[in-house]
């Protein structure tokens, strides 16, 4: 009914509606293909980088320099037999990886790669949409642990739920601090605000940027916080019973979330598609190039940490999230807000709301 009302109100005819639907469909398909390729080659980059750090060669047989290795891995997983445990809940067992995979892609619909390159611009709730979508991804893991009817999988799912409680508050509040400084919830406006407030969003937000980065390490179950899938304790955790494309969906979902978390960090703390320090001399380079370079830099830190640090104990993660990060973020929000008020540097949008 709403669609019909919009068509009548805006004077759209059937041809225009079909054309617009076709354009949106092409954009969605192009975005999904680019994300799948980026995710596949992130796994290749990870294996190469870690191999270099460990004085190994890494994948080098499939194609020149091993560049076809992700495609070979994808073909292998497609042709593997999907095995479902006899006592598993069949429907939930199949649905769980689909939930995780779809939600990992859904957040990309509002990410601005450049000022004019964004699938769907949400002016008010872009940040809330991403936080909601990424937080729902844990339900896929919990369902997988329950449906597998395995003790290892169930323990991995319980760990994932408790882990989310530990880091989610600190991560969300670090984003709230950025919203206070910019006075915006539109992702593009947050990037544009960093043209006029580079000191506030780089130097003042640096501690929160570090906390946010560590939180997305936990969010994506990466070392040193890969407790839900700890090989030495839980074999493979929540996905221990999965094979074939179901396992591939969990695998792709994890790496797609890595790219999504790195992209959001780039937008919040690193200037998004703007050149470094907003230097005029570098504006001739397209914004999406800067965006990709910054995201790649954050992703390299993911890989570097995996090759360097051991796994945290479970109690250490809980302590870090709730007793270290949460008080620091709350204190930093109070400090930044106080400085903004007493230095008359409140953003116009926030000042208007407070004056009312």
Swiss-Prot record:
GO molecular function: NADH dehydrogenase activity; oxidoreductase activity, acting on NAD(P)H, quinone or similar compound as acceptor; quinone binding
Membrane topology note: Multi-pass membrane protein
Reaction equations catalysed: a quinone + NADH + 5 H(+)(in) = a quinol + NAD(+) + 4 H(+)(out)
Annotated localization: Cell inner membrane
Keyword Translocase found: yes
Enzyme Commission identifier(s): 7.1.1.-
Enzyme class: translocase
GO BP annotations listed: aerobic respiration
Keyword tags: Cell inner membrane, Cell membrane, Membrane, NAD, Quinone, Translocase, Transmembrane, Transmembrane helix, Ubiquinone
InterPro entries: NADH_UbQ_OxRdtase_su1/FPO, NADH_UbQ_OxRdtase_su1_CS
GO terms under cellular component: plasma membrane
TM region positions: 22-42, 59-79, 93-113, 124-144, 171-191, 198-218, 240-260, 285-305, 321-341
Family assignment from sequence similarity: Belongs to the complex I subunit 1 family.
Protein's job: NDH-1 shuttles electrons from NADH, via FMN and iron-sulfur (Fe-S) centers, to quinones in the respiratory chain. The immediate electron acceptor for the enzyme in this species is believed to be ubiquinone. Couples the redox reaction to proton translocation (for every two electrons transferred, four hydrogen ions are translocated across the cytoplasmic membrane), and thus conserves the redox energy in a proton gradient. This subunit may bind ubiquinone.
Subunit structure: NDH-1 is composed of 14 different subunits. Subunits NuoA, H, J, K, L, M, N constitute the membrane sector of the complex.
NCBIfam families for the chain: PRK06076.1-2, PRK06076.1-6
Protein name: NADH-quinone oxidoreductase subunit H
Species, as recorded: Orientia tsutsugamushi (strain Boryong)
Gene field: nuoH
């Amino acid at each position: 009914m709403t669609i019909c009302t919009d068509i009548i109100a805006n004077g759209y005819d059937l041809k225009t509606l079909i054309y617009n639907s076709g354009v949106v469909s092409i954009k969605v398909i192009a975005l999904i293909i680019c994300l799948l390729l980026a995710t596949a080659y992130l796994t290749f980059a990870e294996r190469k980088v870690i191999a270099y750090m460990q004085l190994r060669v890494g994948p080098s047989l499939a194609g020149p320099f091993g560049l076809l290795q992700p495609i070979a891995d994808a073909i292998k997983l497609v042709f593997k037999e999907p095995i479902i445990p006899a006592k598993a809940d069949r429907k939930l067992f199949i649905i769980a990886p689909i939930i995780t995979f779809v939600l990992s892609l859904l957040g990309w619909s509002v990410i601005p790669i450049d000022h004019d390159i964004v699938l769907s611009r949400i002016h008010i709730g872009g940040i809330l949409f991403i936080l909601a979508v990424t937080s729902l991804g844990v339900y896929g893991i919990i369902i997988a642990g329950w449906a597998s009817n395995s003790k290892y999988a169930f323990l991995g799912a319980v760990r994932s739920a408790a882990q989310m409680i530990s880091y989610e508050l600190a991560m969300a509040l670090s984003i709230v601090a950025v919203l206070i400084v910019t006075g915006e919830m539109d992702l593009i406006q947050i990037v544009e605000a960093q043209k006029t407030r580079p000191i506030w969003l780089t130097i003042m937000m640096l501690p929160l940027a570090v906390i946010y980065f560590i939180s997305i390490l936990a969010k994506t179950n990466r070392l040193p916080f890969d407790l839900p899938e700890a090989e030495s304790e839980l074999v493979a955790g929540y996905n221990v019973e999965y094979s074939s494309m179901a396992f591939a969906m969990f695998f792709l979902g994890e790496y797609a979330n890595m790219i999504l978390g790195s992209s959001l960090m780039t937008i919040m703390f690193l200037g998004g598609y703007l050149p470094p320090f907003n230097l005029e001399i570098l504006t001739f380079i397209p914004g999406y190039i800067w965006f990709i370079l910054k995201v790649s830099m954050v992703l390299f830190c993911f890989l570097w940490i995996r090759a360097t640090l051991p796994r945290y104990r479970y109690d250490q993660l809980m302590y870090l999230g709730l007793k270290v990060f949460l008080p620091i973020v709350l204190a930093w929000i109070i400090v930044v807000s106080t400085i903004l008020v007493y230095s008359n540097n409140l953003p116009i949008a926030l000042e208007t709301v407070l004056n009312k």
